[in-house]
Amino acid sequence: MKETIDFLIDTIEARQVLDSRGNPTVEAEVFLECGAIGRAIVPSGASTGAHEAHELRDGGTKYMGKGVLDAVNKIHETISPALCGLSALDQTIIDKLMIEIDGTPNKSNLGANSILAVSLANARAASKALDMPLYRYLGDPLSNLLPVPLMNVINGGAHAPNGLDCQEFMLVPHGVKTFSEALRMGTEIFHSLKSLLDKKGLSTAVGDEGGFAPELSSCEAAGDLLLEAIQKAGFIPGKQVSLALDVASTEFYRDGFYKYEGTNLTSSQMISYLSNLVSNYPIVSIEDGLGEDDWEGWAALNKEIGHKVQLVGDDLFVTNTERLRKGILEKSANSILIKVNQIGTLTETLEAMDLAKSAGFTSVISHRSGETEDTTIADLSVATRAGQIKTGSLSRSERIAKYNRLLRIEEELGNQARFAGDLGLGPKNI
């Protein structure tokens, strides 16, 4: 039996490492008195919302200004001295103390990247000290639900240098009984899609998240390709495998218009366009269908199609409880995307998920386009019984690492493991 002193933080180390785009990011290690060590690496986004917590970068010439040595120094010089001697089991106290020391609304003093690295590393250290898997430590004995994967197999927008304005076209394999079956289904469709692209003379180069980045002219062209790939792989669109979109509308919202596929659309016209897509394709989820501050448009979109599909706020909510409360009050959406680095601590992430659940919203755990080998979000999805996870395509090892972690968790849970399947999707199945 470990004594209380065994869980005390002895020291915290940090370093600059690289993410999947070759850009610097922060890695932190929390060392406990008992010898347990927790390590975490933070991700970084390409299409970042204006309301996200602040990511500290060095500027200057090294790494084109994207170095994070300042953030590393903040951990060594400010965060570590403040946290040493505290119990790693007191996650909320640790996170709130870092927020207090930072003293800014968006963590621009210490940097969300430095704070989050320590927050996640601390949770890992605590779980190791207790000899528990992270999903069990963060969750409870009933944390046995494996999420439906939303697999980004065609990349566009800020994630790929092609002509697609829509950022992500995702496969949603839900009509099976296990996560491993869903992963197999998605993988077979991914390879089917590659074969189709080859035959059509289209590029099979991949984007930031491992999806293909062919030169396509429209969202509909991508949707048609996915339906063809699903059927070619031997599966039934809409029954076994559905589609999801991340429109990332903020990226092309300018001067009151959505500059989409060569035309200027009003909010009302964009809503009509999305409604038509839902009518013509087996789409179960649309993320960021409108811009991050188009609150009136979001409410209209939710009224129009929120009873049919999951409407996910990413840039709209940025994993922030204040913006989520506004969205709940105004009935702006029915789901929230959860990105730990948007808010900057594990505690605030869990608070956002609790608030979403209390309002009947679904939560989708998500990676970022600049990822690492860190697999925390896989454990988080099971710990919180989120029911859905976005962690990229079926290529690039920083994406596969999360899928492989979920396979191990499913195996570890044995006959207690459940797969979210159809029940993991919203809004009708909330």
Swiss-Prot record:
Mg(2+) binds at residues 246, 287, 314. Its main location: cytoplasm. It is an enzyme of class 4 (lyase). The active site is at residues 209, 339. GO terms for molecular function: magnesium ion binding; phosphopyruvate hydratase activity. (2R)-2-phosphoglycerate binds at residues 167, 339, 368-369, 390. GO terms for biological process: glycolytic process. Keywords: Cytoplasm, Glycolysis, Lyase, Magnesium, Metal-binding, Secreted. InterPro entries: Enolase, Enolase-like_C_sf, Enolase-like_N, Enolase_C, Enolase_CS, Enolase_N. It is found in: Cytoplasm; Secreted; Cell surface. SMART domains: Enolase_C, Enolase_N. Belongs to the enolase family. This is Enolase. It comes from Prochlorococcus marinus (strain MIT 9515).
